[in-house]
């Protein structure tokens, strides 16, 4: 692994490839992979709730979102960490590299359908509804417009590249950053 201390955030909408990229980065560089989903599961366990119970609880308690985000910020104090989450780029203001992955909703729906074993149409509807709800929630909770990509250093349309191609693009950026630290 190159020398230095980097904090990288990877954000994107459902089916854009954030988890795949983060796993590849963690494996290649030995980065610690922190993701909001894991933090959320840990919090459910801490409260003795199933994931489903905790999701319903979190919908009624905005402090859960704030705690997930706080824990992501805390993780950013470590060296050589990749933090995955829709708001990670917004929350981890001092990240060395902020990445946004995107793809047309139809492509993302196909990926989610394959991953979850549902129809593309069902995945499309779930994604569209979730994105609308999340956008409202982020605006209300933080005043953040998730569609504002101006904070990102690197924006990649993952429909144009294989997972290996996306990794190669990001690897080139990280290797360049390591030359500077």
Curated annotation (Swiss-Prot):
Gene3D superfamilies: P-loop containing nucleotide triphosphate hydrolases. It is found in: Cytoplasm. GO terms for biological process: pyrimidine nucleotide metabolic process. GO terms for cellular component: cytoplasm. Keywords: ATP-binding, Cytoplasm, Kinase, Nucleotide-binding, Transferase. It catalyses: CMP + ATP = CDP + ADP; dCMP + ATP = dCDP + ADP. NCBIfam families: cyt_kin_arch. Belongs to the cytidylate kinase family. Type 2 subfamily. HAMAP family: Cytidyl_kinase_type2 (MF_00239). This is Cytidylate kinase.
